[in-house]
From Swiss-Prot:
Biological source species: Mus musculus (Mouse)
Similarity comment text for this entry: Belongs to the glycosyltransferase 31 family.
Cytoplasmic side: 1-6
Tissue: Ubiquitous.
Spans within the Lumenal topological domain: 27-326
Protein name (record): Beta-1,3-galactosyltransferase 1
Gene label: B3galt1
Amino acid sequence: MASKVSCLYVLTVVCWASALWYLSITRPTSSYTGSKPFSHLTVARKNFTFGNIRTRPINPHSFEFLINEPNKCEKNIPFLVILISTTHKEFDARQAIRETWGDENNFKGIKIATLFLLGKNADPVLNQMVEQESQIFHDIIVEDFIDSYHNLTLKTLMGMRWVATFCSKAKYVMKTDSDIFVNMDNLIYKLLKPSTKPRRRYFTGYVINGGPIRDVRSKWYMPRDLYPDSNYPPFCSGTGYIFSADVAELIYKTSLHTRLLHLEDVYVGLCLRKLGIHPFQNSGFNHWKMAYSLCRYRRVITVHQISPEEMHRIWNDMSSKKHLRC
């Protein structure tokens, strides 16, 4: 069995490399960069992006799972579910996470479930590669919306829906991105503390208090007619936040009656405000890149903009030097 899995893994890696090389020379890589104005985005019911959001007063989230892991929480209820937003071409990033901080077997006696979140790609080759990857690792879920920057909110809501439907008895959930390094020791033992009673209606991360950017050239541009207020409610940076599992269902159900926004973290903040849940500030969450040093990284929970190579290097260094004092 092990040799079969190894062969499948090697085959998948080779196929990924071949496919990505082919795509790089035959297709543009900026199909879904989010640089186009809203009016140019696809508007078909199953394939819509946020171009038609102004005419949609509610969000029915009528998408189907193309890839699912409905039994992932069946045998053992996880203490923590990790939802990682990723894109089809980021195989190396997913594999780096599987082999480092996202390894579900890192903590004896503490069940962790790691899942990568994806939409549907316009390229059937990439969809097929992700399906093969899923058959090997069983840690990917996909719904049939177009995977794009402007649909990150749908991706997060898919994760919330999955937890509420298939893993509602978990204690905590983390939502993060594929270029984030997570100090799991700090997250598990210093923040969540498995020996204590699980919290309810709990939400924490790097809290941002700000308002909409009206410059159309900005990545975070927010049209006035989509969000007319001058301030956002407090929200946690989408690079990484933690919440009690009961909040997943609360946010998902609230989203069904809350006008969608393309800025995922802002939208989650809007849902929290409706629910009367105030996100707590935690200085361990960083939404920027930070130069590596052993002692510095021992004090944090998340660090942004980490490449797969850096992920391995940081993990190996921290794992081999646990006996050293700072």
